[in-house]
């Protein structure tokens, strides 16, 4: 595999499992030294996962103080960060909007939307100073379509898309590119939070008739995070199996 990310440092939030782990593995394979951010980072099996991150940090992305402290520590240790992948997220409960628990709403927004803002807010000044950066935010088809019974998740991911577009315009001449990926449903441990009915309904929307693989997201993210993606910013890359209509 081409080492087109050789010499670059990438932070992947929520990188201990699922989509985040697949992204971390793919960036490492492309030559990047990878920093893993997650709530708990001790349970890492280098043999099973195929590599050892250059740094693993316990970070709560819903806390600006936690994000800022971790980023400062990463810079002190590594000197530079060229790539940020905002992947950390939760689904929240599957329930009608008028019955949605306010505390669950707040938690989903805090992690899935505020977390993206906090990480970008912290990393962007460093990238601007260096005149180079690649930020990839993991959104969702739910953020484009709005999916019934997951109103908080849909709202948060729509916010991620809008934030990405706004910030990308601000940074368009600074060498820092922001894009996001909008996957259809992926087979990951997060499915445990969903009902069988919700899973079946989601699959029925995908013309290809299957769920997305985490590795397919990782392949897309790896290209967006690389130097060959040089004239695209503020864009939403769909991974929908034919579901996307705009």
Predicted regions and their residues:
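Conserved glycine-rich cofactor-binding loop
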Residues: 9, 16-17
